[in-house]
Amino acid sequence: MARMNRPAPVEVSYRHMRFLITHNPSNATLSTFIEDLKKYGATTVVRVCEVTYDKTPLEKDGITVVDWPFDDGAPPPGKVVEDWLSLLKAKFYNDPGSCVAVHCVAGLGRAPVLVALALIESGMKYEDAIQFIRQKRRGAINSKQLTYLEKYRPKQRLRFKDPHTHKTRCCVM
């Protein structure tokens, strides 16, 4: 069987947020996937596609795998968006500069959309978020997902009240 030519993992950094967008590994390519995660310091993987590998080896290496699958080519359901933003708020507030890996099948649709949502929620315009991601991941985000991002209204969920000054701050400053 011919191997699919998959794009290399891509790091997207904005303020103190770091994401690793990648394609899904298989059990046969899992060791390379784990090496990539370690190289970028990713300790959390968000899997938004069907299961294609055993997550036990990752967990043995201290990497948490979260499963939030949704349909290929589609925008994420509200529950996935809420869970994603809650994860990021906690992760980047407690460990600024840490890296969260996210993957779908090819790393061109579902995963980049979630990263775009994070960028938008932290204050970036949707057009800028898409361009920022596409500069690093050519072909990312299809037209249906693009329309979703255009209509998406951020609620600034990656922001928090500073307990000392009582001012609203971005959790990723």
From Swiss-Prot:
Any single Gene Ontology cellular-component annotation: early endosome
InterPro entries noted in UniProt: Prot-tyrosine_phosphatase-like, PTP, Tyr_Pase_cat, Tyr_Pase_dom, TYR_PHOSPHATASE_DUAL_dom
PTM characteristics: Farnesylated. Farnesylation is required for membrane targeting. Unfarnesylated forms are shifted into the nucleus.
Record: active site: D72 (proton donor), C104 (phosphocysteine intermediate)
Matches recorded under Gene3D superfamilies: Protein tyrosine phosphatase superfamily
Keyword Zinc: no
Residues that, per the record, bind substrate: R110
Lipid moiety-binding region (S-farnesyl cysteine): C170
Catalytic class of the enzyme: hydrolase
SUPFAM superfamilies linked to this entry: (Phosphotyrosine protein) phosphatases II
A Pfam family the protein falls into: Tc-R-P
Source species, domain of life: Eukaryota
Tissues with expression: Present in the small intestine, where it is located in the differentiated epithelial cells of the villus but not in the proliferating crypt cells (at protein level). Expressed in heart and skeletal muscle, and at lower levels in lung, spleen and testis.
Resulting phenotype, C104S: Loss of enzymatic activity; reduced migration-promoting activity
One example of a Gene Ontology biological process annotation: cellular response to leukemia inhibitory factor
Protein location: Cell membrane; Early endosome
Residue ranges annotated for the Tyrosine-protein phosphatase domain, each copy included: 8-161
Disulfide bonds: C49-C104
Induction description: Down-regulated upon skeletal muscle denervation.
Keyword terms of this UniProt record: Cell membrane, Disulfide bond, Endosome, Hydrolase, Lipoprotein, Membrane, Methylation, Prenylation, Protein phosphatase, Proto-oncogene
Principal cellular location given in the protein's record: membrane
Assembly mode: Interacts with tubulin.
Full protein name: Protein tyrosine phosphatase type IVA 3
Gene that produces this protein: Ptp4a3
